[in-house]
A protein has these predicted regions:
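Residues immediately within or flanking Cys/His clusters that coordinate Zn2+
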Residues: 84, 133, 156
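C-terminal segment of N-terminal export signals and the immediately downstream linker at the start
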Residues: 22-62, 70
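Short, non-ligating residues that shape and space the ligands of small metal-coordination modules
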Residues: 96-97, 145-146, 168
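Short cysteine-rich clusters marking metal-coordination/redox-active sites
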Residues: 87, 136-139
Length: 174
């Protein structure tokens, strides 16, 4: 191995190491905003009746019945503060505000989850087309879908139902 190959390999290895820690770095830099991406995910299982008591009818329809909220109706579309978007059902950290972008679709959109293990993906063949459904890894809540038309660096657009999430603002330290 010559010197140039050795240096190139070292740079590539360093870049890979830095990028593989990116979601954890995002979450840890959010201060007091809750994040649970580094912890093992323990499943939350409830009956339909329990979910109906906990969630509003709209939240239940979207998260448990795989519904879709009307576009441009979520207050989360207008959040531009630093913090974490959590699952409305179980409070698992899902997305950092740092990965949110304006997709002009009417739903909150992100280019990456806060940690890959916090979401789960399934093939969705409903509506006569094949899409990739995104679910909460802890409670299996339907969150939305992911598409391959997002911005750099991932090229992904996690198009989420705002009603399936809640926002936890980063706390300022004095």
């Amino acid at each position: 191995m010559n010197r140039r190959s050795f240096i190139s390999s070292g740079i590539a290895l360093g870049a890979f190491a830095a990028l593989s820690r990116l979601p954890i770095a995002f979450a840890s830099s959010l201060g007091d905003a809750r994040s649970e991406q580094a912890a093992p995910i323990k499943k939350v299982v409830k009956t339909d009746e329990e979910w109906k008591r906990i969630l509003t009818p709209e939240q239940y329809n979207v998260t448990r019945q795989k519904g879709t909220e009307a576009p441009y109706t979520s207050p989360l579309n207008n959040i531009h503060e630093e913090g974490v978007f959590e699952c409305v059902s179980c409070e698992l950290a899902l997305f950092s505000s740092r990965t949110k972008f304006e997709s002009h679709t009417g739903w909150p959109s992100f280019w990456s989850p806060i940690a890959k293990q916090n979401v789960r993906e399934e093939v969705d063949n409903s509506l006569g087309e094949t899409r990739t459904e995104v679910l909460c890894a802890r409670c299996d809540a339907h969150l939305g879908h992911v598409f391959n038309d997002g911005p750099k660096p991932t090229g992904l657009r996690y198009c989420m139902n705002g009603v399936a999430m809640k926002f936890v603002k980063k706390q300022k330290h004095s």
